[in-house]
Amino acid sequence: MSNTVKIVRFHKTGPAEVLQFDELPLPEPGPNEVRLRVKALGLNRAEIMFRNGQYLETPVSPSKNGYEAAGIIDATGADVDTSWVGKTVSTVPGTFKLNDHGVYGEVAVVPFHGIAEYPSTLSYEQGASIWMQYLTAYGALIWLGQVAKGDFVVITAASSSVGIAAIEIVKVEGAISICVTRTAAKKAELLKQGADHVIVTDEEDLVARVNEITSGKGARIVFDPIGGKILESLAAATAPKGIIFEYGALAPEPTPYPLFTALAKYLTIRAYTVFELTPDPVFPKAKQYIFDHLASGAFKPLIDKTFHFAEIVDAHRYMESNAQIGKIVVIL
């Protein structure tokens, strides 16, 4: 193995072009860490926001980036059983900081508690397309929302990897998904992925369609990463005593709180991220739930497009185009 490796870092915040390949000494894992020889990277919207300096974590220059990698463990630090060397694993978002352990690179050093095995039937590309989407959806819909058979669940940004995961979880739990997308271009694919209903907001009134689908009852759960002005419409479409999960802030404008609607219907409007789930005692149960459904084939990571490692800037640009349905993956 070479004494140096290529690691993607950025030395200032900004557009995709700030990402650069830095040739660095091969890093050694510290106590309770492992090193992966990376085979695939799964991109997430959080990494775009981090690169832009608009994320929950502030970049420390020069900063690493990347939450999700799949690969083979080739070294272990102190306090980690060496029998893990040679095993195929993927990294789990929410268990480490991007500044400390960002995984964009030929190798990645991450905490031992930040890895997980996945079914051997999955490819490296699929292995890098699991934990952010399914854990995020599980935490809101199952852990906190307690989705039940027959519930109506509104899923905005439904063509994202998290949105697709939410569709799958809603289906296996016997609930009914109402997926929201801006244009008709993605409607057919969302239906193919298992959406029960699709609302195209450029052509249809969101509140009217939800009321039509639910026979006027509204949705018990709303799962939204957008915020902004759509929150008022989502509140209007939510059933009395329903819950709205805000798990992102994709809208560039402020998010007004729909006070009167919330008061009138006793709504819960709740902020949530995967970082709330990962330290909780339910975390192992969440991972097992996801593993089991991946193994059974009920969950199947949808990969929209793959890029080579040298094209990671193009991969970031593609994510920002919002053309994808599912996961964008970088292969090494």
Language-model features: locations:
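NAD(P)H dinucleotide-binding glycine-rich loop of Rossmann-like/cofactor-binding domains
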Residues: 82, 91-157
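Glycine-rich beta-strand-centered segment in the early N-terminal region that forms part
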Residues: 25-43, 54-96
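Short amphipathic alpha-helix with an adjacent loop that forms part of the alpha/beta core around
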Residues: 206-216
